[in-house]
């Protein structure tokens, strides 16, 4: 009887060890899967942030081009709301704070009392700073960074692209004319960010 009890206890110990080992293996598999998913999501998030920076600078680049001899017929004023919606949070918070308020104040004073000293090329940047400073909380925190703002950015990019292609005389000319290539590439960069952001959001 004692031998049977001993064998039963030994069998129970073996079963317990096997069960613990099995649980440990499952934990290892779960940890590896969690690490893989976190790495994947982190990479996707980094991609969105990087493309957001790229899109914002592309929009600023197009604004600068519009004030040079490379001026196009497209409605570049739409780049202002695009920059507002796609500007990275770090830069947005900096420009919508006291720094932006001082810049906006100086711009308004110059425009009102010294119009001759207020160059035309400052109209767009001044409008952007004013928009960043006076935008309501709802627009700044509930439209920016959400799928609504991303969709609006996508529509702006698509509209600017089709307007640019039409002004260039066709799709081929937009890539072959010296003045058209730089604008075309800039607008394509405007489209990459919202498209990728929507894909990541769906995933």
Swiss-Prot record:
Membrane topology annotation: Multi-pass membrane protein
- The signal peptide, as residue positions, is none
Q: Where are the transmembrane segments?
A: 44-64, 75-95, 99-119, 121-141, 145-165, 180-200
Record keywords: Cell membrane, Membrane, Transmembrane, Transmembrane helix
This one is known as Cold-regulated 413 plasma membrane protein 2
Per the record, the similarity remark reads: Belongs to the Cold-regulated 413 protein family.
PANTHER family, alphabetized: COLD-REGULATED 413 PLASMA MEMBRANE PROTEIN 2 (PTHR33596:SF23)
One Pfam family recorded for the sequence: WCOR413
Task: Write out the annotated subcellular location.
Answer: Cell membrane
Q: What GO cellular component term, any one, is given?
A: plant-type vacuole
The record's annotation in InterPro entries points to: COR413
Membrane topology (Cytoplasmic): 65-74, 120, 166-179
Organism encoding this protein: Arabidopsis thaliana
> What is the gene name?
COR413PM2
Source domain of life: Eukaryota
Q: Which ranges of this chain reside in the Extracellular compartment per its record? A: 1-43, 96-98, 142-144, 201-203
């Amino acid at each position: 009887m004692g031998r049977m009890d001993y064998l039963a206890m030994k069998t129970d110990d073996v079963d317990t060890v096997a069960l613990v080992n099995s649980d440990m293996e499952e934990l290892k598999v779960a940890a590896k899967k969690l690490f893989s998913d976190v790495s994947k999501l982190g990479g996707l998030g980094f991609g969105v942030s990087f493309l957001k920076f790229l899109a914002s600078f592309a929009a600023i680049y197009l604004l600068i081009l519009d004030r040079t001899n490379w001026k196009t017929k497209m409605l570049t004023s739409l780049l202002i709301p695009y920059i507002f919606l796609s500007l990275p949070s770090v830069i947005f918070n900096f420009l919508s704070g006291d720094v932006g308020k001082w810049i906006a104040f100086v711009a308004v004073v110059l425009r009102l009392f010294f119009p001759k000293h207020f160059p035309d090329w400052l109209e767009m940047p001044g409008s952007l700073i004013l928009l960043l400073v006076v935008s309501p909380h709802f627009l700044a925190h509930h439209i920016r960074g959400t799928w609504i703002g991303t969709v609006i950015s996508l529509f702006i990019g698509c509209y600017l692209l089709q307007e640019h292609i039409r002004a260039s005389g066709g799709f081929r000319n937009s890539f072959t004319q010296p003045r058209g290539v730089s604008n075309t590439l800039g607008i394509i960069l405007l489209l990459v960010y919202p498209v990728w952001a929507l894909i990541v959001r769906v995933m």
